[in-house]
Design a protein with these regions (language model features):
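Canonical tetratricopeptide repeat
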Residues: 117, 151, 192, 227, ...
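Helix-start (N-cap) detector for alpha-helical repeat units in TPR-like alpha-solenoids
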Residues: 78, 112-113, 146-147, 187-188, ...
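Structural signature of tandem alpha-helical TPR/SEL1-like repeats
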Residues: 92-99, 124-137, 160-178, 200-213, ...
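Short coil/turn linking the two alpha-helices of tandem helical-hairpin repeats
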Residues: 153, 158-164, 199-202, 357, ...
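Alpha-helical segment of the N-proximal tetratricopeptide repeat
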Residues: 74-107, 120-124, 161-165, 195, ...
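TPR-adjacent "capping" and linker segments in tetratricopeptide-repeat scaffold/adaptor proteins
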Residues: 63-80, 355-364
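Structural marker of alpha-solenoid helical repeat scaffolds
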Residues: 107, 141, 182, 217, ...
């Protein structure tokens, strides 16, 4: 029904770097995902096509008095709403796309395409909980729909801070496995099965077999090739993995595939190796927010904060509802010691954050870090304000409680 496109982003200082790396690789921070060039991440680039639609040839004519639309009129309006949503999504006008798909759902709530399209819009914006719900609605309307199964599997492997990731990863594997049973010649289904296994920490012959089956079905499937290379490297089979990476880079003809390769490199902490790959991706698509996000992440790890700021700001202009982008932009401002900018950016991030993400914002790389910066700058009153904001988000943070008390005692009354 929907179809798919295979496009899938001193000792004290040492401790700080390790903490930052763990935060960068954690669920809520590092896993922005590439979906049609709009998101990216270690789960792999994967873009479900827009739901199929056929725009009506004649616009609905006004009637002299209100009448109940007949089935043909409802169908025409539904198809037009889907088309409007598809066009808006392709133009990255997400609010308009969401409105259009919701309108389609109201017209035909049992047609899976409306919920499926809505899920795509949420996934494009990394709104994983809402995307999951929308895709589940699509599956409820069409339980054996392979496209919906794979879309849901994709969303479920996106780690979420504080979420029940283990169960989600297991569900993702189950949905992908069901898809392979329904369509045993679907290369994407086997690739998603392998991705779900890797998300669960399964780097063994079963994961390898899933990716090899995908490549057997489609030898030109570069995305599966990159996924296989990652598994082989994890199994210390570098002699097999590295040629696959090199081949994938040579074959990559589009930005999303290059983003996937770069993200796989960053997953292995090959930060500097990822930079030329991302530069090439941005030559192909200067507004690819996935490439911009990964570039900013690499620069943050390397303490190139001014360059990271530029990358994250550009990514945020394209995807303004990304918590991860705003969170790491705030981290760049901390590195630049621009604490007022960090405070404002973390406030924007708080508006986009899940409950678990809000707790994260209360820590050392959030409002707590802003408070530390203000203390360092001798601005104790502002430090108290930042610490209090951190405690609003994470009331049980004992370290911030202690720092707030000390700052309050030093603050002028």
């Amino acid at each position: 029904m929907f179809g798919w496109a295979r496009r899938q982003f001193s000792s004290g200082n040492s401790i700080t770097v390790l903490v930052l790396l763990s935060l960068l690789m954690c669920a809520g921070v590092a896993r922005a995902q590439e979906t049609g060039g709009d998101l990216l991440g270690g789960a792999g680039i994967f873009r479900p096509r827009n739901p199929e639609s056929k725009r009506s040839s004649n616009p609905t004519r006004p009637v002299a008095r209100p009448t109940r639309p007949n089935p043909a009129e409802i169908e025409a309006r539904f198809e037009d709403a889907l088309s409007d949503g598809n066009d808006a999504r392709d133009a990255r006008k997400y609010a308009s796309a969401e409105t259009a798909y919701r309108g389609a759902i109201k017209l035909k709530p049992r047609d899976a395409r409306g919920s499926y399209g809505l899920g795509n819009v949420f996934a494009d914006q990394q709104r994983w909980d809402e995307a999951e719900n929308a895709y589940r609605d699509a599956l409820n309307a069409s339980p054996a729909n392979v496209e919906a199964l794979l879309a849901l599997s994709f969303v479920l492997v996106q780690p979420r801070t504080g979420a029940m990731n283990a169960k989600r990863f297991a569900d993702a594997e189950d949905f992908a496995h069901r898809a392979t049973g329904l369509q045993p010649n679907n290369a994407v289904a086997f690739d998603r099965l392998g991705v779900a296994m890797v998300a669960r920490g399964i780097f063994n012959s079963d994961a390898e077999a899933a990716f090899r089956r995908a490549l057997q079905l489609d030898p030109n499937f570069v995305v599966a090739q990159v996924h296989l290379a990652r598994v082989l490297r994890h199994m210390n089979r570098f002699g097999e993995a590295d040629p696959l990476y090199n081949s994938a880079i040579a074959q990559a003809k589009d930005a999303p595939t290059l983003v996937l390769i770069a993200d796989a490199m960053q997953t292995e902490q090959r930060w500097n190796d990822s930079e030329p790959v991302l530069s090439r991706a941005l030559e192909l698509d200067a507004k690819n927010p996935g490439a911009l996000f990964l570039l900013g992440r690499m620069m943050t790890v390397n303490k190139r904060y001014a360059e990271a700021e530029s990358a994250f700001k550009r990514a945020g202009e394209i995807n303004p509802k990304s918590f991860q982008v705003q969170y790491l932009l705030g981290r760049a401002y901390l590195g630049l010691e621009r604490y007022d900018d960090a405070l404002k950016t973390y406030e924007r991030a708080a508006e986009l954050a899940s409950d678990a993400d809000r707790i994260q914002l209360g820590g050392a790389f959030g409002f707590g870090g802003v408070g530390d910066g203000f203390v360092k700058a001798g601005r104790t009153r502002d430090a108290v304000r930042a610490y209090d904001r951190a405690l609003q988000l994470d009331p049980n943070n004992a370290e911030v409680q202690q720092k707030a008390a000390v700052a309050r005692a030093k603050s002028p009354q």
